[in-house]
Structures are given as C-alpha cells and as structure tokens.
Amino acid sequence: MADLEAANINHDNHLLLDQPCLRLPYELLRKNFRSVHYPFEWDSTSVKNVVKETANGLISGKASPQDAVENLDQMLVKMRGLKRKLTAAAKEEDRLYRQMDSRVAHLRELADLHTVDDVRYEAWSRQRLDRLLVDYMLRHGYDSSAIALADERGMRDLVDIDTFVVMSRIRKSLEGGSVQEALNWCNENKKELRKMQSNLEFLLRCQQYIEMMRTDSPAKMAEAIHHARKYITPFTETYPVEISSIAGLLAYRPGTISEPYASLYSASRWQKLADTFVEAHLKLLGLPMTPLLHIALSSGLSALKTPACHSTQLQVPTQPEESQPVNGAGDGAATATAAAASSTTSTAIPHHHHGTASLTTRVCPICSTELNALARSVRYAHHGKSRLLEQDLVLLPNGRVYGKARLDEYAAKSGLPAGQIKDLVTGEVFSGEEGRKVFVT
C-alpha cells in the first residue's frame, strides 16, 4: 500500500515548483500593457486637444488654413509614432500568449498523469529537467548554452530566454563599471521599484557620484556636487546615513584607509550593485532568487539527508558487505550513531557512507563533492511512516539496532557460545539478555 502511495503523483507539489513557469508570462503581459497604456492615453488626449483647438481656431478665424495643415501634420506624426508602439506591443502580446498556451499545455500533460510508472511521465519529467537546466544557465550568464539547449529540445516557449538575456546584459554592464543600462531599466520600472521600496536607483546614483569623485579634476568634483544635489538629495529622508557617508568623500580622496570611505571607493561595489540589480529584477517579476533546479534538487536531497552527512571526519568500518546495520527509510539518528560508533575497526575518511557498506557501491549522494555544499542548508525530511527492513528488531547496549535473526546468524558464524550476540559492525559481544526488543510506532 505504501509503495502505491509513493508511486502516485502529487500534482500540487509539482505546481509549486512550476508556478514561475506560468507567473512570468502573466507579469510580462502586465508590463507590456503598462508600456503602451500611458503613451496611448497621453497621445490620444493630446490629439483630441489639437483637433479641438484647430477647429475652434478655424471657426473663429484666429487660425489660418496653413496653421491647420501644420497642426494636422503634427497629429499625423504623433499617431504614426503611437501606431508603431501599439504594433510592437501587439506582437509582444501575441508572443506571450503563445508562451502561455504552450506552458498550460505542458502542465496539462502532467494533470493527465497519475503515477510515476506511466511511460509518459519519464518523457515529461525529462522535458522539465531540460527546462530547469535552461533556467539555471540563464541565471548564471551561460546564455549561448541555454539558447542552444532550448533550440535543440524545441522548447523556446517553455523558457524565458529574452527576459534573462536582458538581465544578464545589464548585470555584465554593471560588473564592467557602467550604470547607464541599469538606470534606463530603473526608469522603465520606476513605479514598481518604488512600490517594492527598492534602493537600486539610489545606489546607482551614488556610484555615479563616487566615480566622479574618484578623479582629482575640479570640474569633475563640481559636476559631482551638482549630480548629488539633483539625484541624491531627494533621498535624504530615506537614506540619511548613506548620504552622510558619501558626502564625506569631498574630504577623503581615493587611497584612504579610513572607513567607510575606503569601502565606498572599493571596486567590489560594482559586484554588489550587480547582485542588487539581479535581486530587484527577479523580485519585480515574481521569480524566486534560488534557481529552480536547486529547489527541485533540495526536495530529493532532503529525503536522503541524515545528521551524519556533514560531519567533518567520520569513521567508515572495514567490515564485510554482510555486516550492515538495519537502517529504515529516514532513520537518520540510527545512521549517525552507526557511523560514529565504529571506531575500533575503521578507516578515517572525509565523508561517511551510510551504513558502512562497500566503499565503491554504497556512496551517499549527499556526501558527494557535487551535492554536499548544496545539501548543507537543506532540512532533514519528515517521515510520517516507518518502513522496517527486518522484523523482531533488537536494541543493543551501544545504541545500534539489528534484526534478531541476523544477530543469531552472525553469532553462529562467529562461533560464539549460546546466549551471546555480536555487533555486526563494531564486533562488540553482549549477552542476549542485554538486548531490548524494539517496538516501532
């Protein structure tokens, strides 16, 4: 019964992971609408006013026919410009709707699946893995590789290449020491950033001021003061401490060791600006800061993680393959005890191998070099049900648990007198009366 439940697909959990897949096109549709809504309202009102003024001027005789023609020409220029904006917005809207249709269809395929044993589930999960890999590469700046994978798998509409390419370009410009593209982005999203209470624009303006102060040119210093009055002073009530610090740069030149001025001149601020931009960009679009691939891996890592996985120096016994303690699923405490207690016949290595099995076949995934750091911050899994690998469990005085049949069999193989039992790992010998029966609830 438990195996059948484990094979069932939990659609709610899948949708939690795939939520950004649907959220981003929706957020981009809203942004696309806002980008043309205000220009449309502004230009429409302007054209109506010009038409009204021209008509009234002709009727009253205050405007000549030549003036009317010039006004009409101006209206035509505005309307043509508005038409170009609306056409571009309509194309973008069609693209986003196409993406949403593809993503809904992709998730609908999952809704039609009920167990992981379905042959269609493997193909679907493989496509999702490819999508998560593309997301990971885009977040880390591997744009060419991400685009190549998306094109090879034919899933352009399932990933957000254009959005992340723009983010990557602006991030690289900040890392290269330029704030202009980031400021343009802030200007496009000024209202949303203000609602988020983001300090990105303030930090960018401060960096412009710092770069002006970095030179010894009196003209540049005068320009920096003018820049501060225009762009930084409006933030006085919000960031008084920061503004006081950057004002002190007038007295402290580059190369100073006095803090906080030395940190303000530090080149590492560019990387901090890039990180702040990425954080604001993802938050604006409702995307998680952690790559979706890490989120997906974390659930599996949590199921496998035990308290012994991040011990700095654990002992791995050199007992034969058959000498393994009984570890049920999720029995992290028993595993940790087993690893720690095996000090008499063991070899010290950096990572443990859960259950003291063969060093070549029983390597814990959590202890692998690739996943150990990622799993460090993952919580231990909650196991609501116990699964017994052996019946009639016996607790030895040293805290280890084994099946009674295996203890008796191992005692016989070891040639022990009747009534004695031997720990399969440590080799400790106990009286059979010292073992306590274990009842798992």
From Swiss-Prot:
Q: Write out the biased-composition intervals (Low complexity).
A: 333-348
Positions of the UniProt region annotated as Disordered: 312-354
Under the heading InterPro entries, the entry gives: CRA_dom, CTLH/CRA, CTLH_C, Fyv10_fam, LisH, ZF_RING_GID
Please report the stretch or stretches of sequence annotated as the CTLH domain. Answer: 163-220
Q: Which UniProt keywords apply?
A: Cytoplasm, Metal-binding, Nucleus, Zinc, Zinc-finger
Q: Which GO terms describe its molecular function?
A: ubiquitin protein ligase activity; zinc ion binding
Where is this chain primarily localised?
A: cytoplasm
Claim: Ligase is one of the keywords in the record: no
Q: Looking at the UniProt record for this protein, which Gene Ontology cellular component terms does it annotate, in alphabetical order?
A: cytoplasm; GID complex; nucleus
LisH domain sequence ranges: 125-157
Where it sits in the cell: the answer is: Cytoplasm; Nucleus
Compositionally biased, Polar residues: which spans?
Answer: 312-326
Q: Where are the zinc fingers (RING-Gid-type)?
A: 364-426
Primary role: Involved in the proteasome-dependent degradation of fructose-1,6-bisphosphatase.
Q: Which PANTHER family match?
A: E3 UBIQUITIN-PROTEIN TRANSFERASE MAEA (PTHR12170:SF2), MACROPHAGE ERYTHROBLAST ATTACHER-RELATED (PTHR12170)
Instruction: Say which family it is in.
Output: Belongs to the FYV10 family.
Name this protein carries in UniProt: Protein FYV10
